[in-house]
Regions:
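Surface/interface-facing alpha-helical segments and adjacent flexible terminal/loop regions used
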Residues: 1-160
Length: 160
């Protein structure tokens, strides 16, 4: 196989490397394995999954904050449905080793920043907590309605 196959045709490269690795697993001596790129790709698989979970978490928080901030918007039903889809996807992809890497507070701040200038139906959002009121277990395990109530309670605490 050509040396530049990795750069030209990722599918053909990955199929060829998988074939070579199967031969190595059977005990054959194979000198063609592109170890540098194989190692890089294995590392990228984990990072890709982590980034997907982080993206879903961000979207979950954005949608919870939208529902909380603009509860009378006609879009609330859609936001709730999208939240559930992001939650299911994140929970399905989440692995315990990700827990130590995910910075939930940062993702919450990013969601707040994203909504800072949002204006739905010409209204500003209701007050919301500056700090993330959720933990990962709640975000992955709790029902949407329970998370909305938790956010509501946290926001009520800042009004006093």
């Amino acid at each position: 196989m050509p040396d530049d196959l990795y750069d030209r045709d990722a599918l053909a490269w990955s199929e060829h490397q998988a074939s070579l690795l199967r031969r190595v697993a059977r005990g054959e001596r194979v000198n063609e394995v592109d170890w540098e790129h194989v190692i890089e790709e294995i590392e990228d698989v984990g990072l890709s999954e982590l980034h997907a979970v982080q993206s879903d978490l961000h979207q979950m928080m954005v949608h919870l904050l939208k529902v909380h901030g603009w509860p009378s918007s006609p879009s609330v039903g859609r936001w709730r449905g999208e939240f559930v889809a992001f939650q299911k996807d994140a929970a399905r992809r989440f692995a315990p080793s990700m827990r130590q890497t995910i910075d939930l507070a940062r993702h919450y701040r990013d969601a707040l920043e994203q909504l800072e200038t949002a204006d739905y139906e010409g209204t500003s959002p209701r007050a919301r907590p500056a700090d993330c009121p959720f933990n990962l277990d709640q975000l992955f395990g709790d029902k949407r309605a329970a998370l909305e109530q938790h956010l509501e309670a946290a926001a009520a605490g800042i009004k006093a």
